[in-house]
Amino acid sequence: MKHFSLLFIVSVFILSAPASTQAQSHGPYDAAHNLGESAFQNPLASVSAKRPRMRDYGIRTGVMQPGPLNAITDVKGVSVGHVTLVEGDSVRTGVTAIIPHPGNIFREKVPAAFWAGNGFGKLAGSTQIKELGNIETPVILTNTLSVSAGVEGLVTYTLERSGNGDVQSVNAVVGETNDGELNDIRGRHVKAAHILDALKKAAPGPVAEGNVGAGTGT
């Protein structure tokens, strides 16, 4: 089986969120709809939603009890959004967006840390995390050859946020996984508009798992 780089899982930890959670404008989102709604439909979503989780079988891990959702969204203010691309027999990929709080993340940066257990990965933004100890954008997960699309989408998202009119540098954080076994990864089907759509769809509450978003082709 091909090695899947999941460097993000052990690399970026949201330690706390700023108290301010004012809503901001979302100027760039309309661009996502230019691709058509059909591109974002997930015919496998119902399968993912019904699959039992490990704890449903009585298997327990760790010494701490999970939150009520047993998801990253148990942390107040965190939201997650997915875009899943399933087209024909060859496209099985997508995007997962993690937003640590609903305010202006560039202005209200979130403490973070980086540690590489296996450096065979393409985690964009890791060097500034090590240098400054924070993140200033949401976190995007996608396939290995679409990291650049993730960066482009996050830069657009950040520049268009209300209050960021003077921003000239953005440390976009994008993790990846290689879905080339099931997906036409060389086709680079994920575009910046898909990144923006995943950010727009991000919400608190239960999180779809499995073959959805960035996990579709893995």
Question: Which residues does each predicted region cover?
Answer:
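Positively charged n-region of N-terminal signal peptides that target proteins for export
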Residues: 1-4
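Boundary at the C-terminal end of the N-terminal hydrophobic targeting segment
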Residues: 19-25
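Alpha/propeptide regions of enzymes that mature by internal proteolysis
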Residues: 26-218
